[in-house]
A protein has these predicted regions:
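NAD(P)-dependent short-chain dehydrogenase/reductase
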Residues: 46-89, 95-96, 102
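Active-site Tyr-X1-5-Lys
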Residues: 8, 31-58
């Protein structure tokens, strides 16, 4: 795109390119996904990394028509919900990612070719759901569950650190909730 049309591509990838067995992962670690989704995301990274800016992360956000993501899934539930105490991630909200991409586009030095991890504070799915429960005033009963053991935490890329200041999960979720309700 850059050579032919003068445009640059920012591709969003996933922490699911990793198995979750050897965290934390740097942007130079080789993907080792054990499932089809993660493996195909890893292939897309390989195909694009020489010509695009690949932002590897995990996102949480509101959805328009589905309830597949963790946030919307939880908010659509009623009653008892399992919260995985040993399932860790450190992604960002979709609003935080959008702000970062805007900064990268508007910055003279923000856009670079390669793979870059975008991360925030490491959190378990259980603790994340507890924050969501409090913020959204959910009546769901979150039951601690230790059956799942996975950690897809990423080490934030130095270049991303220079262009983005991340907030804690509560702050990110408050900002996203306010933006979504406007």
């Amino acid at each position: 795109l850059k050579l032919k049309y003068g445009y640059s591509l920012i591709h969003i990838s996933s922490d699911c390119v990793f198995s979750g067995l050897n965290a934390p992962y740097s942007d130079t670690d080789q993907p080792d996904a054990l499932d089809h989704y993660g493996a195909t995301k890893a292939i897309s990274e390989t195909l694009l990394e020489a010509d695009a800016m690949v932002l590897r992360t995990s996102t949480v956000g509101h959805e328009q028509n589905t309830k597949h993501g963790l946030l919307e899934w939880f908010l659509s539930q009623s009653g008892r919900v399992n919260g995985y105490k040993n399932a860790y991630f450190n992604g960002v909200t979709t609003l935080t990612l959008a702000k970062l991409i805007y900064q990268l586009i508007c910055s003279n030095v923000g856009f670079r070719i390669g793979i870059f991890n975008v991360a925030s504070e490491r959190i378990s799915k259980y603790d994340f759901l507890c924050i969501v429960q409090k913020l959204y005033r959910s009546d769901n009963n979150i039951v601690p569950d230790e059956k799942v053991d996975i950690d897809r935490s990423l080490i934030q890329s130095k270049h991303i650190n220079e262009n983005y200041c991340h907030s804690d999960w509560m702050t990110q979720l408050i900002q996203m909730k306010e933006e979504f309700n406007d």
